[in-house]
């Protein structure tokens, strides 16, 4: 009986000592109590995408990259990775429902969604559950700005404006630019402001700023104003249809200048429409350069061509989907846990010069990536990288 009392006393002393060493009860639990979910046989990663509906094709491109990375790296910490699919159908109500499903299925991290609105819908649900998420092609600043558990693998829209301004001043050596942007388009207005602010900061001047109505048929009056001002470079953050018309009509008014655009131009449809325009007429920012030069770029291209054919060309969303998966995998390994979301998110944001297929990736304090931007043009009826803008941070 006496021995039992002594043993019980020692147990109580151990527990009290342990609690006094822990700042909170949560820390005690995390340190000494094994979570049953840590013992599961697979590690679950959520794939939150529109896999049906009118946005299905875009969701499939991101999913293709995620699945390719999963084939290359099928395990984490010795356990098989299970991809858990959540079809948000690009619908707000459905998005909320399937985001909650991912929480119930105890995924460790979520990848997606295509469409910033879809990610914004899921964000508070994932934040409440402390489940980190990585957006793949969302360029809306709000995705990360007000959502501490969301990061992104692509750069924000405004940074494209910054990169193009640097290209115009530092590579083209043109210090007088014009901007031509669609009226009432918040996205275009934001990236135009970023371009203009950086251009002026670098010593340039915005000679002329003109709005136009998207969907119009004739832009010659606006283009003549740029010609009269002698503008040699014009930033046009517009869709493919409007941009192609503007570029062709510039020839009609004999406006000799270079048009700068965003990654929206990196589509086969745009290439077909402007292929005859020439190398010196078009330059745009891109989310991916096949010549990025990292070992992971080579790994990605080798796996992609093996699966889809040597001549297959990966879409940028597929490359970024691949990077989102391998970044998530790295964060889980670094955290050493699949259930402590706050620690996983902390380790995710600590990545510096991480080798992705799209280049070296670091994160700032809110989860936006710090990465190089490829500037491309049309050459021999193909998109070709002509310059890389390397950000200087710190």
Feature locations, PLM:
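Hydrophobic alpha-helical segments within soluble ligand-binding/sensing domains
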Residues: 95, 153-177, 189-191, 218-220, ...
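Extracellular/periplasmic bilobed ligand-binding domains
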Residues: 126, 176, 191-286
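Periplasmic-binding protein-like
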Residues: 47, 102-114, 134-136, 178-182, ...
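Extracellular/periplasmic periplasmic-binding protein-like sensory domains
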Residues: 247-322, 333-335, 339, 377-379, ...
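An alpha-beta-alpha
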Residues: 150-214, 232-233, 309
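Solvent-exposed, acidic/polar segments of extracytosolic/periplasmic ligand-binding ectodomains
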Residues: 24-43, 349-394
